[in-house]
């Protein structure tokens, strides 16, 4: 049985917040690529991504 896709937030070894997007099959499809200094900032990055992706062009 598949799980729902999700954003996984975590603190890395340097103490920075990061995110991963996990697909329904459990595989990581994307990650933040950079660390954030607070939970608020990582949440803001996730919300920006969720808002912008529907209008993203395939190039």
Locate each region found by the language model:
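Short N-terminal "domain-start" leader segments
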Residues: 1-18, 22, 29-32, 47-57
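A cross-kingdom feature marking solvent-exposed beta-strand/loop segments within repeated
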Residues: 28-44
């Amino acid at each position: 049985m598949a799980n729902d896709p999700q954003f996984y937030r975590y603190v890395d070894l340097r103490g920075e917040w990061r995110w991963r997007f996990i697909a329904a099959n459990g595989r990581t499809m994307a990650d933040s690529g950079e660390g954030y200094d607070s939970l608020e900032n990582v949440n803001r990055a996730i919300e920006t991504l969720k808002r912008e992706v529907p209008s993203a062009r395939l190039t």
